[in-house]
Curated annotation (Swiss-Prot):
The gene is murA. This is UDP-N-acetylglucosamine 1-carboxyvinyltransferase. Cell wall formation. Adds enolpyruvyl to UDP-N-acetylglucosamine. The active site is at C117 (proton donor). The modification 2-(S-cysteinyl)pyruvic acid O-phosphothioketal is found at C117. The keyword Transmembrane helix does not apply. It holds the Pfam family EPSP_synthase. HAMAP family: MurA. It comes from Shewanella sp. (strain ANA-3).
Amino acid sequence: MDKLAIQASPPLAGDVIISGAKNAALPILMAGVLAETDFIVSNVPNLRDVSTSCKLLRCLGADVDELGNGQIRISTKNLNEFCAPYDLVKTMRASILILGPLLARYGTADVSLPGGCAIGARPVNLHLHGLEMMGAKIEVKEGYIKARVDGRLKGAHIFMDMVSVGATENLLMAAALADGETVIENAAREPEVIDLANCLIAMGAKITGVGSATLRIQGVERLQGCEYRVMPDRIETGSFLVAAAVTRGRIRCLKADPASLESVIAKLEDAGAKITTGEDWIELDMEGKRPKAVNIKTAPYPGFPTDMQAQFCVLNVLAQGTATITETIFENRFMHVPELIRMGANMELEGNTCIIQGIESLSGAQVMATDLRASASLVIAGLVADGKTIVDRIYHLDRGYEHIEQKFQGLGAHVERVQ
């Protein structure tokens, strides 16, 4: 099984090209099921979850051609299966996003209950409740969600009990082909939801309120394929910016989207980083200084993203001062903390809050990745730890970061993939 071997590295320096956003690409690929003609998606990152999504679409009978250069073409003319099996779904929670498109277009869907990162209860009840309000008959048995609808789904007024990105996306796709108007209140406002909505609009969907907490979808009878470019990955961007801050370096992230990262940029500036942005680039310069501790509380967008919490734990571990990090989105999302403590970090957990006293340096150790973003934090810690750090189980990392070791090497880091 692959590992990453990391030696203490100089301050990161240079340019890094940001990949397409995994969390936008996955729902957009699933939206291909809604299109009656060929659908071409570009800027798709080369990741394990993307490969799983393509396998899932092929398993349903869709023709999926990887055209190279991050382009994927999807044709549904031969789609004739409506079951997303356990062996595919267990590795990727986003497989649940096939439910809305299959049900809306074909009236039937059997989807295994999902797997993915082990970061707490991420219930699918919001997805199911919304679809039931649109007229679907759903039962959960033998580990599968079995959903049926006679004719078309019906427009409905849906209030989400809690903000859920996945449920918003599933219901948005389902509503695009429903009969009548659907209103989704307390909808997620994440940039990836906006990207999916813009893709659906390019396919012919009628959606208003994009980017707000109230989405209105006037269902249409059919959607056509289009060509659509996936937005840049804001979490990958943020991860490299934090790595540069921790190593006291200076980097530029190219093909990025500064507008989607305002809360992260604000916290990096609080930590002492000098940040300059253009339309599609972000430059961070620590001017050789140690970062200052910053308090973090995760929240749905436009608040601070839970997917950047682990990386800021590392920043605070090596910062001047004391900080608290409070996780409000997922429970069980501090699994990186025991690993960082093994490297010498001074941190303790109290419920959903981590209290961190900054120290000057860490020691290299063998550590284990437990989920996608935790693994990124361990890599960043390894860059500034004395000696050698080995990160095990990096298949988590490969689910969300494209060519991570090559990108770090390009910035001067001593990172290599080993068996």
